[in-house]
């Protein structure tokens, strides 16, 4: 069993980590839930759904080295550019670190610095980090102490297109993604304020979203492919629906395409391939670590694949716990087996 710390526990991803860890069979204790702003406040005051699970746990702000010394694994759920200041001390303390920010996701530090506009504070650790998408990097995850949890959009996009790219069926993939507002975090803004977005559907950063180089990096490891990506803010709380348009010299029947996906993801506990012509539904994955994938072959050198994930679970905290399970040799599904909600 493991002792866990969460650095940055007051936001949505921190709350989702707490929710999923509360009944994890291999978690002895969540010892730290940190927040400088809320130090001393009961965790359940911010996450009232967890009142019975954490009646005595309070937000704290200890030294990162101390957290690393006291915990077997630490999740960093802090903003981009903040994690790289903390991770070296957490590792020095002896903990395995699973970072939910973008700070260690890129193989090339220069790419990170270009897209995030800051100089990397711990480039010496970048080569040690493993991109934490278990479906592609399970063996490497088992051997590292620094796991870079993928972004929410890249998770849905990469899982939708990986079989197409690795099999060399397409030359170009165009991703169109719709996300719920929880992906923007707990701090409200004019764009994510409910009256502004409840009856709207808005593309943003249509050609230069920060998740684009992340998708390109991972799919580029599978094959030679050109990647484009446009996200949209949808009037939802949770969920990301991604449609991948694959273009190339490809003619394939829907049944054959589905069989390719079933074989590619055979044995993957959190990938569910829909029936031919069946579209994945967001409500079917809400609150779960599943990624549902639907395949459509339309002819004329084009195939369409859609994926659905919960951006806070498989797109963030659930995947982070999946990575913990893999790293520590637990059952990969431990703490993550609850079905979705309907309706």
UniProtKB/Swiss-Prot annotation:
Pfam families in the cross-refs: Semialdhyde_dh (PF01118), Semialdhyde_dhC_1 (PF22698)
Q: Which residues are catalytic?
A: 152
| Predominant cellular place of this UniProt entry's protein | cytoplasm
One biological process term in Gene Ontology? L-arginine biosynthetic process
Recite the UniProt keywords alphabetically: Amino-acid biosynthesis, Arginine biosynthesis, Cytoplasm, NADP, Oxidoreductase
State where the protein is found: Cytoplasm
Q: Name one GO cellular component term.
A: cytoplasm
Enzyme Commission (EC) number: 1.2.1.38
Name the top EC class: oxidoreductase
Q: Which reaction does it catalyse?
A: N-acetyl-L-glutamate 5-semialdehyde + phosphate + NADP(+) = N-acetyl-L-glutamyl 5-phosphate + NADPH + H(+)
Q: Name one GO molecular function term.
A: N-acetyl-gamma-glutamyl-phosphate reductase activity
The pathway it acts in is: Amino-acid biosynthesis; L-arginine biosynthesis; N(2)-acetyl-L-ornithine from L-glutamate: step 3/4
Name the InterPro entries for this protein. AGPR_AS (IPR023013), AGPR_type-1 (IPR000706), NAD(P)-bd_dom_sf (IPR036291), NAGSA_dehydrogenase (IPR050085), Semialdehyde_DH_NAD-bd (IPR000534)
What does this chain do?
Catalyzes the NADPH-dependent reduction of N-acetyl-5-glutamyl phosphate to yield N-acetyl-L-glutamate 5-semialdehyde.
Into which family does the record put it?
Answer: Belongs to the NAGSA dehydrogenase family. Type 1 subfamily.
UniProt protein name: N-acetyl-gamma-glutamyl-phosphate reductase
Q: Which organism is it from?
A: Methanopyrus kandleri (strain AV19 / DSM 6324 / JCM 9639 / NBRC 100938)
Which gene name belongs to this protein?
Answer: argC
């Amino acid at each position: 069993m493991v002792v866990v710390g969460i650095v940055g526990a007051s936001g949505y991803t921190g709350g989702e980590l707490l929710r999923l860890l509360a009944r994890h069979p291999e978690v002895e204790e969540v010892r730290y839930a940190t927040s400088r702003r809320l130090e001393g406040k009961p965790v359940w005051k911010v996450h009232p759904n967890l009142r019975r699970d954490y009646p005595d746990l309070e937000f704290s702000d200890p030294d990162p080295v101390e957290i690393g010394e006291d915990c077997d694994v630490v999740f960093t759920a802090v903003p981009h550019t903040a994690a790289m200041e903390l991770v070296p001390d957490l590792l020095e303390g002896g903990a395995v670190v699973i970072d939910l920010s973008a700070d260690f996701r890129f193989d090339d530090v220069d790419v990170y610095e270009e897209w995030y506009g800051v100089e990397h504070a711990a480039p010496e650790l970048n080569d040690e980090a493993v991109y934490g998408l278990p479906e592609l990097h399970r063996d490497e995850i088992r051997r590292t102490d620094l796991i870079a949890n993928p972004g929410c959009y890249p998770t849905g996009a990469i899982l939708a297109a990986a079989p197409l790219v690795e099999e060399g069926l397409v030359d170009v993939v165009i991703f169109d993604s719709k996300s719920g507002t929880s992906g923007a975090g707990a701090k409200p803004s004019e764009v994510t304020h409910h009256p502004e977005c409840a009856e709207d559907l808005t593309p943003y950063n249509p050609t230069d979203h920060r998740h684009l180089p992340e998708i390109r990096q991972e799919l580029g490891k599978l094959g030679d492919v050109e990647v484009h990506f446009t996200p949209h803010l949808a009037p939802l709380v949770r969920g990301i629906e991604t449609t991948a348009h694959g273009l190339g010299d490809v003619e394939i029947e829907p049944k054959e395409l589905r069989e390719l996906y079933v074989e590619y993801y055979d044995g993957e506990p959190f990938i569910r391939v829909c029936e031919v012509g069946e579209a994945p539904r967001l409500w079917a994955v809400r609150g779960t670590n599943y990624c549902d994938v639907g395949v459509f072959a339309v002819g004329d050198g084009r195939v369409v694949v859609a994926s659905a994930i919960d951006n806070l679970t498989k797109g963030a905290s659930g995947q982070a716990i999946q990575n913990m399970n893999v790293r520590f040799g637990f059952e990969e599904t431990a703490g993550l087996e609850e079905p979705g909600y309907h309706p």
